[in-house]
């Protein structure tokens, strides 16, 4: 079955999508078989690419749209949302 899921999330950690946070996001996205894209201000990036995620320049307060296509798309988008909401595991 070909699923599609999309959701928008606000980056809430103080340092934004820096290297460590981007790596955690990519590692999580890579656990799912679906294609995953992040979008911000007309730019999009493969959520399974650290360089792509870093190039989006997601600072605190940035709203990113997560779109997944394929098997487990909904679960993937929700998991990424939970990671973002948890500040990528960083202290608040």
Which residues make up each language-model segment?
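Residue-level signal for pocket-adjacent positions within structured domains
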Residues: 6, 10-12, 83
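Compact, glycine-rich, soluble single-domain proteins
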Residues: 10-51, 55-60
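C-terminal structural segments of small proteins and small subunits
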Residues: 59-92
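Intrinsic-disorder/low-complexity, polar/charged segments enriched in Ser/Thr/Lys/Arg/Asp/Glu/Gln
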Residues: 2-8, 63-65
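Intrinsic disorder/low-complexity segments
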Residues: 6-8, 23, 69, 74
């Amino acid at each position: 079955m070909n699923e599609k899921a999309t959701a928008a999330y606000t980056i809430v950690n103080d340092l934004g999508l820096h290297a460590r946070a981007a790596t955690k996001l990519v590692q999580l996205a890579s656990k799912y078989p679906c294609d995953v894209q992040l979008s911000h201000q007309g730019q999009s990036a493969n959520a399974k690419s650290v360089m792509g995620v870093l190039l989006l320049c997601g600072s605190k307060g940035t709203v990113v749209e997560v779109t997944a296509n394929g098997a487990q798309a909904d679960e993937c988008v929700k998991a990424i949302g939970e990671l973002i909401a948890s500040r990528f595991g960083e202290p608040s």
